[in-house]
Design a protein with these regions (language model features):
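PLP-dependent class I/II
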Residues: 1-139
Length: 139
């Protein structure tokens, strides 16, 4: 915590290393965030804003009526149903938006962009493939 409370200042011996590490981490997070948001916005029924000061994004998802009906038949909130299907199909964990007090009739999920940069393409591909299959199944 000391480093966060009092980071090295310009002129101190550790400043250059600290600044390079910090900028490298932040740059990587920005790149992963942009890549994920861009990919999510290409998916049917998903709208995702850029992350602002967080390590997650919170896309909205328009679920087909048949998916909503299947969720209700299973006794689950529609976004929970989607999140569980995603987990079971891909191993990817997202948090259903219904736990955050979303507006009635809207659906969201929260997902991070913390996987290593080298893994992001694979995560995005698995998520995109699942989403296309899910939408096709319930459309």
């Amino acid at each position: 915590t000391g480093l966060m409370v009092r980071p090295p200042k310009a002129g101190e011996s550790s400043y250059a290393l600290y600044n390079a590490e910090r900028e490298g981490i932040l740059s990587s997070l920005r790149a992963r965030s942009r890549k994920l948001v861009e990919a999510l916005n290409k998916l049917e029924g998903i709208v995702c804003n850029e992350a602002e000061g967080a390590m997650y994004v919170f896309p909205s998802i328009k679920l087909p009526d048949r998916a909503i009906a299947a969720a209700e038949a299973a006794g689950k909130a529609p976004d929970v149903f989607y999140a569980l299907e995603l987990l079971e199909s891909t191993g990817i964990v997202v948090v259903a938006g219904s736990g955050f007090g979303q507006r009635e009739g809207t659906y969201h999920f929260r997902t991070t962009f913390l996987p290593p940069e080298a893994d992001m393409d694979g995560v995005i591909e698995r998520m995109s493939s699942f989403h296309a299959d899910f939408m096709g199944k319930y459309r």
